Amino acid sequence: MKTSKIIIASLVSLTLVSNPILTFAATNDVIDSTTEITTDKEISSTQPTIKTTLKAGQTQSFNDWFPDDNFASEVAAAFEMQATDTISEEQLATLTSLDCHNSSIADMTGIEKLTGLTKLICTYNNITTLDLSQNTNLTYLACDSNKLTNLDVTPLTKLTYLNCDTNKLTKIDVSQNPLLTYLNCARNTLTEIDVSHNTQLTELDCHLNKKITKLDVTPQTQLTTLDCSFNKITALDVSQNKLLNRLNCDTNNITKLDLNQNIQLTFLNCSSNKLTEIDVTPLTQLTYFDCSVNPLTELDVSTLSKLTTLHCIQTDLLEIDLTHNTQLIYFQAEGCRKIKELDVTHNTQLYLLDCQAAGITELDLSQNPKLVYLYLNNTELTKLDVSHNTKLKSLSCVNAHIQDFSSVGKIPVLNNNLDAEGQTITMPKETLTNNSLTIAVSPDLLDQFGNPMNIEPGDGGVYDQATNTITWENLSTDNPAVTYTFTSENGAIVGTVTTPFEAPQPIKGEDVTVHYLDDKGEKLAADEVLSGNLDDPYTSSAKDIPDYTLTTTPDNATGTFTTTSQSVTYVYTKNIVAAEPVTVNYVDDTGKTLAPSETLNGNVGDTYNATAKQIDGYTLSTTPNNATGTFNTSSQTVTYVYTKNIVAAEPVTVNYVDDTGKTLAPSETLNGNVGDTYNATAKQIDGYTLSAEPTNATGQFTSSAQTVNYIYTKNPAPEKGVVEIHYVDENNKQLSSATKISGTVGDNYTTEPKNIDGYTLTTTPDNATGTFNTSSQTVTYVYTKNIVAAEPVTVNYVDANGKTLAPSETLNGTIGDTYNATAKQIDGYTLSAEPTNATGQFTNSAQTVNYIYTKNTNIDQPLPDKKTTKPSNLKTTEVKKASDTLPKTGDSTPWKSALLGVFLSSTALVIWKKKK
């Protein structure tokens, strides 16, 4: 019986060794009925079986497959093996997920062997290149925080997640990744990002590239998160992103942002742009909003009832209404100098309030019991009451104007967290008394404990603690202010009080009037009035008066202002000088002399008086302004103008007729006075020509009626000419429809060429301009087709999986030219189908022609290598996956060994039965 068992065991072993396929099937049976291996003993017991599952092909250690030791270790760990263990290429292809982040990897060579990968995480390494052309099953790729300068993901058509953040990429092509839902290419040096083919994106992050000037996300209708901050984008259209929940576009050059369609937004940061207005009233779900560092003057947040955070730092807002934002927790308006008032009494949930450098002068914090952080530096606040803010942990109000800090002491935690240096207080202006000034120290200067603060006078003042006053002596208005400082005991509060002062107002003296008269008491020049304070000196001065000499300088030419008005009189004598004559003329309104001129003579400064004359038939119409005046050193003319007495004349009738006497235009009637001149004028009458100018077209009105007749002759009908304009190429092919122009024979014509797309004018005809004549004329403009280099056509030779089988070809040409791509003969492959665009025309867009081949099927395959391999530490589940692969069609099977095994087994069974 024992011998029989040994024989049967030997036969079975021989059969299994002779037929590995049977061994593989047996292994599957074991795995299917076994749970996950948990003990060293179990692993050891399965190693011989795993060892037999290694497929035929190259087998070497992980260190051999992967030159980078750190990478080799990470891949080995994924198989729960050591880097020195051996593994086949087929087994490497079974790995589906690899996380080798933060492993100091510099070289990813060998990644191409992991063709089964669907997920790869290689973040936080020192990788400079990453070739994933063979990893076409990847759906998840995270390669951020490396040193990549180039990343080609075009073969990864199944990719749904891509994170290449924090590298050195200057470009990224995701046009072949239509399934992407997540894309993070932030912190690179991209100048553009085209996501027009990625319509499934829900998250896009391209911030901190600093060079992107435009971004089109209109195709991304599923987008929920967008971060394009820290770039140079000037315009952003999010009207099609109606599912957008988070938008961060800060630190760009955006001038306009329309958010009317983005009503699901909860987070919005558009700070540091160039927005002059923004409408957020439709965004009722918004909880976070930052519009800081924009030239905004208005902002309506009344509909944002869910808002918890609002930042409007360094804007030009004139006001901000927070009464509807009752959930507000964080509010910052730092640098908003134009905001003078702020009501936070409705914001009972406030945790942080920052109004530094705002223009507010008062602030009611009585309704903010949850306030923890309060920043009021560089404000115009003069009062502060935090007695209701018992949870305050930090208060800073440096460089304000606050005197009383007693409310702070009611919150013990603030005693060591109060910063109130640099307070400046300006008191009302005081008046000096004998160059001295005494002022009372402000009783409102109280520290956080309600105690008076320590006082230190400046500018040489003396402090009297008993009277709480400070006195300054010998003050000068050259420095018209005095100061003193105040300090709390713990030094948290420091400030300066400034009191401006002025000298007593002086008493005004009565005015001094200075007169300038001749020796007859006549005024020669305007008086001067001198003003000043009582007892101040005054000085008067004489004037230079033409033709007069000063003869008397008054004794009181200088003196002092008194309580009585004073007069100072300078007396002059006229100089005797013969003047030029004054000529008096008498003329009509045409300048014609009507009577002899008169000549008046005298001395410079003397008065002259001209008189009019009575002239028969004329009436004086103009009395000259200088009829009375003063003789001087220049000759003068006085002209009296007369008008002839008017006698109405009979009218002159002007007719416009043809040679038969037919009226062609309404008559004109000319009226005037007897002796006046009339001038009749001809009219332009369509279709007629004036025959002759009448002899009496010009004449004088008389006491008799007169008639002037303009006679016209009818014009003959004009003869017309035609010019036809053609637009052709150098082969006389018509490029545009011909046009015609017509006109009167003898008139000039001008033609113009047309702008024809794709063509340039080469010949302007000599007769482009000319004269219409009785014959039809032809003008022909000749054009030459433009030669424009087209974008290339790339011809690829690939298998059904997109794998390159032969080098691509590049076809070049001119736009409009025809291209012809050709297939290649590739050993072991057959062309599946001729691409539809194998022949076409070059255009201004790059084109791709793909020849797709099918691998030929080999009938005869070599027998598998029977060499044994080292035991594997693969998990049972992974061994099962590898063993599920059946022989491919055409693989040879060791049937002879199988039949021999069956025969021997049968023979042994018969012998055993006989012995039994």
From Swiss-Prot:
LRR repeats: 94-115, 116-136, 137-157, 158-179, 180-200, 201-221, 222-243, 244-263, 264-284, 285-306, 316-325, 338-357, 359-368, 380-402
Keyword Ion transport: no
Region described as Disordered: spans on this chain: 862-888
Membrane topology designation: Peptidoglycan-anchor
Alphabetical keyword list: Cell adhesion, Cell wall, Leucine-rich repeat, Peptidoglycan-anchor, Repeat, Secreted, Signal, Virulence
Family indicated by similarity: Belongs to the internalin family.
Sequence positions bearing Pentaglycyl murein peptidoglycan amidated threonine: 889
Protein name, per record: Internalin J
Organism whose genome encodes this protein: Listeria monocytogenes serotype 4b (strain F2365)
GO cellular component: extracellular region
Cell compartments where the protein resides: Secreted, Cell wall
Propeptide residue interval(s): 890-916
Disulfide bonds: none
